[in-house]
Amino acid sequence: EYTLKGSMQVKAEKDGKPVAKPLEVDGEPVEAEATFTPEKSDGTANVAFRFNSRDIKPGTELVVFESLERGGNQLAAHEDIEDVNQTVTVTAPAISTSARDGIDGDKDVVVDDEATVIDTVEYKNLVPGKEYTLNGKLHSKSTGEPLKVGGKPVTGQTTFTPEKADGKVEVTFT
């Protein structure tokens, strides 16, 4: 039986050279380990790191350092701050939108008791399988103020669970 122990490192620079700085979340280093029994002399094993990345600046590069142990003795280590195969980049979710008339799809909404605007929201860097809610509010382009009907803002909301990190979803305003 073998144990893989890993630590997450922040790739930084000192004097123009890349250096490793241990990643800490809530004052604790981000570490993980996995125990496995190999079926062959060569193979792979996964080590899953779970941590809150909300406070990590987008664009930050994180590098995994790992050691292989058996019976408490270190047999091998991989600690290369420049290894692209051990590097991930923190990304932030992003959205862009495109609104259209809900009746005929053009950019003109006819004055009507039941006007509808559909906003197609293109999203990037979401977590597949996690539920998200998009909330929208129509604004007057000329004033920048929220559009109100009967004294209430015109809003739309859609809850969805993406299958992929990037995609599109629609929010309907009525």
Model-inferred region functions:
Residues E1-T174:
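Solvent-exposed loop/turn and edge beta-strand elements of beta-rich ligand-binding domains
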